[in-house]
Every structure is written in C-alpha cells, then in structure tokens.
Curated annotation (Swiss-Prot):
Binding of pyridoxal 5'-phosphate, residues: 76-77, 102, 156, 175, 198, 240-241
Similarity comment text for this entry: Belongs to the class-V pyridoxal-phosphate-dependent aminotransferase family. SerC subfamily.
Cofactor(s) listed: pyridoxal 5'-phosphate
Nucleotide-binding in keyword set: no
GO cellular component: cytoplasm
Protein name per the record: Phosphoserine aminotransferase
PANTHER family reported for this sequence: PHOSPHOSERINE AMINOTRANSFERASE
Main function: Catalyzes the reversible conversion of 3-phosphohydroxypyruvate to phosphoserine and of 3-hydroxy-2-oxo-4-phosphonooxybutanoate to phosphohydroxythreonine.
Enzyme Commission number(s): 2.6.1.52
Amino acid sequence: MSAIYNFCAGPAMLPTAVMKKAQQELLDWNGQGVSVMEISHRSKEFIALTKQAEADLRELMHIPANYHVLFMHGGGRGQFSAVVNNFLGNDGRALYLVSGQWSSSALAEAQKLAGDAQIDSLNIVEKHNGLNAVVLPDLHKIDADYRYVHYCPNETVDGIEIFDELDSPWPIVADLSSTIMSREIDVSRYGLIYAGAQKNIGPSGLSIVIVRDDMLKLPSLVQSSIMDYRLAVEHDSMFNTPPTFAWYLAAEVFAWLKSIGGIASIAKINQQKAQMLYQCIDSNTFYRNGVVASNRSQMNVTFQLADETLDGEFLKQAQVAGLVALKGHRIVGGMRASLYNAMPLEGVIALVKFMNEFAAKYR
C-alpha cells in the first residue's frame, strides 16, 4: 500500500512508531494479559505509566518544580471554561488577546461565564499590505489589575503563529493546543499552559494543563469537579476515571519524542518542513498565503489557489496521490496543511511535488 500522509488539523496523525507499538501491545499491555484500555487506572502498573509520562513531559519541556502537570478530560474548549471558573472569582478581571478563531472562541466563553467579573479584549491582528500581521501591545502601559492575560500563540484556522514571547506584568495563560512541544518555550514565563492532546500529544479526549502553584491561590468559582484544577492536583489527575488510553498514547508520544532528540530536534525539522512548503507557495502566483512571513504558522500552513474553481480538483487529485485532509477550515476556505510533529519530512516533500505538478498542469 502506498504511503498516506494525513494533513488533518486535528485529530492529527500520530507517529508511526507509536501506532505500531500500540498495535503490538493492544491485547497484552506490559505483560498484564489485558489491554491498557481494560486495566484499572488505580493499579500500580498504570500509576507507574502516569508517573513516567509526567516525568518525560517535565524533562522535554523543562518544567520547573513549582508547576503542576495535570492530565484532564476534554479539549481546549473545556479549558476555555476551566480557566475562567478557576481564576476569576466574583470580582476578577482578565484580558484576552484576539489573534484568530480560537482566541476569539476563548474570549466568547469567558464573556459567557464571567458573571460579575470583567473581561477585556484586544484585537492584535492588523493588515500590512493586505496580509495579516500580529502586533503585540505593550502590556506594561495598560493601567489595570488583571488576574491573567490569555492568548493563543498559534491559530490553526487562520494560519497565524506568534513566535515572540509575550511580555506581561500579569500571569500569562496560553492555549498551546497546536504548538506544544513543536518548539522550545520558557515555561517559567507562564502562569498556566493548556493544550488539547489531539494535535501534538495523542488522541482527542485528553488535555494537558501545566499550572504554576501560585495560580491555584486565586479566587475560584469553579462548579464542575472535573474542571477544578485544585481537585486535579490533590488527586493526581484521578478525581474520577481518566481517559486511560489517551494517557497511555500520550506517554508513548513523549517517549518517542525523547528518542529522536527532544523538542530541540523536532523544532529544526518543523522549521524545515514549513520553510519548504512556504517556498513552494511563494515560488509562483498559482498559490497564495495571506499572512506576513514573520507570523506564518509552522504547524498550520494555509493557502489558496489563485483560481478557486480548481479547489475541488486539487483536493480530488491530492487524495489520489495519498495526500489527505488538505481542505481549509469552513470559515476561511482554501487549503490547509497541518505539519505537526508526527508529519514526516517525506510527507511535505510529496505535497510540494504534487503542488508543483498541479500548478504546471493548470497554470
């Protein structure tokens, strides 16, 4: 069977080595005679898995000791709610920086749940010569007392990524669902990091939360026990039955990433993949991208065909060539190639070859 390269934005492809290992031990995990999906989450064997998973993630991301690592239910949207409920209390105030679809959704959820708390927002995307560009505000010039400032460094729908570190006098809460472990960051700059697993960590249904200890002292109005960070810390992410298979696969992804040299190593590969694809897009007028070079996403490359009537044919022929899930988000249309950690360089080479041949045929 010919190779299939899955460019889906999420759930995304997983490393082949991880999938093969899961396949091999699906019916007999760790010599237990049963699947990891069937074993008790409170068994010593599974608890050992969770401890190793946390240790590996801490090592990969250089997470300081004063941060808790939580493995929680749900995805990013669940964390939109959890952040508000855990940190704002009755009279808190928060600032949301809006750079695209997902930060806008986080803002909408915060406004819905805030009650008497105050939610402020700033749009940080401007048009520069017709292209989307991020302009980070000087937060030190804002006269306010915020519990936190929320932002999303990578917008999967819009193909926008913020590479500059945010400088804030208030705790930073960041949605890293699509960039976690794709490049190195300084975790100590953040009050809380959350990430849905289904892009760079594992299958959907699991979220990773990395929270600084002092954040847990903020006033809380959280009503849902499974979204209570304090309860999750107290019970080692096992207040109730966790998504065990997703946790197992996340552990295997962490181990795989360590085996290939860690985040520093994969970051170089990710940069190479993105540069190769953007070079193809920029090399002729057949394709176009609507983001300034400094804010082009490395994880989610969005592009349009100059002749949109060819979109259907492009997707049809790409599918035949083994290049799947390239259709852009319904909000923006066009195409989108998601280049998460598990996407091999060979997949991008195959996509570029196809795009060049398609352009030559229909130009």
